[in-house]
Amino acid sequence: MSQNVVILGTQWGDEGKGKIVDLLTDKATMVVRYQGGHNAGHTLVIDGEKTVLHLIPSGILRKNVQCVIGNGVVLSPEALMEEMAMLEARHVPVADRLRISKACPLILPFHVALDQARERARGKEAIGTTGRGIGPAYEDKVARRGLRVGDLFDMKRFGEKLKELVDYHNFSLVEYYKADAIDFDTVLKQCEEFAEVLKPMVIDVPALLDKARKNGESIMFEGAQGTLLDIDHGTYPYVTSSNTTAGGVATGAGFGPRYIDYVLGIVKAYTTRVGSGPFPTELDCEVGQHLGEKGHEFGATTGRKRRTGWIDAVAMRRAVQINSISGFCLTKLDVLDGLEELKICIGYQLSDGSVTEHPPLSAEDYEVVEPIYETMPGWQQSTVGITEHKELPPEALAYIARIEALTGVPVDIISTGPDRKETIVLRHPFGQ
């Protein structure tokens, strides 16, 4: 029986989605990215070999899987070429396996320059963007002045539109941010070269997905970042510029919401965050340092050290509400091995002393909440590489059961290490 499955992060990103997508794609015929850009970083470890992907869907390493980049993704041709070259050097035939929407907005050099200039200008108030042009590209899309992949099919018209955009953004770069101007001729030449590579892969994605659905194929939708970074539902303004939630599938891939059968929420056994923004359960102590070191918590995209903290059931419940999550995949359980006790945030105390089980809507209010914790015993046994649920320590099983009780959602998959083999699957999202 065919199943259409969404896999997304339920925290602030970096939950371990790449491994799980790769693990589950043996049951899918198609993997689709529907939002974000190359600001995502999905790390795969297969038979000890590490692969980091930023733009191309994680299913690209599977021989019989077609990978798709939907219209909700802002596409950097330069980043795509680099990633294709890296994969093709390892004998992965990317051009044969990858298809790209004609409606993808393009990230061009002036978007990157603007992103970085703005972050410098903000100083201590910097949002913590990756500086890769994601936000400015989405701005051009919403302002209806952006260039899209489909525009590359008519280079004369493309050049005319590009000249207007270069002039428009150079004014801000030079006059306001005192940065260097972007050279039109250089960008145009690059785009002409990119066009020749991209054209064979460009397709009508909604039609492609609809045909696959009608043929009974199983489709996986791969989310980037996490629910709490969603432009509408995240800790605004410390968010990304796209809809990282399940609703992004309909708008970012052109796939009807009624056709989705299962939503898998990836949640780390603790919490991390990269960059600025509120983080109620953050740990500035030895435990936090331990989690960061043992969990190798450095951003796959930026290399920045991730902030670490206890798991937050309040934030998870919001993710459940927004995404209609069917089941959780709990990752990095093994990182908690050896801790004497664990804490779960079950509520927030507000500045007026009242208690809430719902996250605030503004970052300012989020910054001042105090987490209310429930303490549970840890375990001393190693869980690394365990593949049977019954082999987990009793304390680990109790921890998992408490997460399920607090969120009302079952933990269907448990990850006990970076390799795809180091996993416990209790209920398969594809029903197989």
Swiss-Prot record:
Binds 1 Mg(2+) ion per subunit. The keyword Hydrolase does not apply. Substrate binds at residues 300-306. CDD domains: AdSS. The active site is at residues 14, 42. PROSITE patterns: ADENYLOSUCCIN_SYN_1, ADENYLOSUCCIN_SYN_2. GO terms for cellular component: cytoplasm. Belongs to the adenylosuccinate synthetase family. Homodimer. PANTHER family: ADENYLOSUCCINATE SYNTHETASE. This is Adenylosuccinate synthetase. The gene is purA.
